[in-house]
């Protein structure tokens, strides 16, 4: 895509990528940022991980509990709320309810694009 060309997307036209039985996503990515719809069933755990990408998580429906940093500070984020996760901050999440969130990453998550995000595809809860 030429950097001077706009792009228009419809979420329903983007295939939902199942990662495990209780977790799926849809991705839109550009050169400098990524937008993801993330679908989590109640009880779904995203294991502790970190990445160089800055992250914003906006909860549209449901609620997530995050454990942040080495001290695992707990933050609950509900519908209508946004969590900013700085680059390289270890974090883990659990769906307190069936949840739909939108994640924004800068730069794009290369591991999500190339499928090397094995921490997310595993059933282990670390």
What kind of feature is each model-predicted range?
Residues 1-32, 36, 118-126:
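A short, N-terminal "cap"/entry segment at the start of jelly-roll beta-barrel domains
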Residues 39-41, 51-66:
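Short, conserved beta-strand element in jelly-roll/cupin
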Residues 60-61, 78-79, 97:
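A cytosolic small-molecule/anion-sensing beta-strand core signal
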């Amino acid at each position: 895509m030429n950097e001077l060309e706009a792009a228009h997307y419809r979420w329903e036209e983007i295939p939902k990528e199942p990662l495990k039985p209780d977790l799926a996503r849809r991705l839109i990515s550009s050169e400098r940022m990524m937008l993801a719809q993330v679908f989590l069933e109640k009880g779904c755990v995203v294991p502790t991980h970190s990445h160089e990408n800055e992250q914003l998580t906006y909860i549209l429906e449901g609620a997530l509990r995050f454990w942040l940093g080495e001290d695992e500070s707990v933050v609950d984020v509900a519908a209508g709320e946004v969590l900013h996760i700085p680059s390289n901050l270890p974090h883990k999440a659990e769906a307190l309810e069936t949840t739909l969130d939108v994640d924004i990453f800068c730069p794009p998550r290369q591991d999500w694009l190339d499928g090397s995000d094995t921490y997310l595809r595993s059933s282990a809860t670390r």
